[in-house]
Amino acid sequence: TARAAEPELGRIDAIAGDGDHGQGMTLGTTAAAKSARESLAAKAGARTLLSRAGAAWSEGAGGTSGALWGGALAAAGGVFSDETAPTQEEIITAAIAGANSITDMGGAKVGDKTMVDALVPFADSLKENISSSKSLKEIWNTAAKAAQTAAEATANITARKGRARTHGDASLGTPDPGAISFALLMQAIADFLQ
């Protein structure tokens, strides 16, 4: 998903940034996936797997978004045990913990034209449905759609955080690449879930 979206993410990032967001996302997701495969092969539990994947993402992608995504995976992993398979409620709680770590570390708020503009509606949707009788796939898919809608709406916002803030209104009419990549990855997870 990140690899397929890399050119478009780079293009929209170049409008009011350095144009490397797509590359960073590809490097981060590739490193995290490799680490996760290695952890699975070593029979690591969910906590260890996500902690290692987070460290790999952070190191592989570098930059601010690498640190944010890496921290989010580590925070999500902290919800799990290495001894038992995660429950649906634990998976949702872990995703919310990951989202909270991004807002805590990055300091961005909704309306700043960042990943947070997609992340908060995603997490809010998960919170609303955590006790639902719906399947994890249904709950996650609804949250991913909320993230996508919010990510697209960032085209109407002037950036107040990150590198894009120094470019004034240059990014108006273009969505935030971090919000778009967040929504893409959450939809990829929804598509993967059973």
Stretches with model-predicted labels:
Residues T1-Q194:
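N-terminal loops that bind phosphate or other acidic moieties
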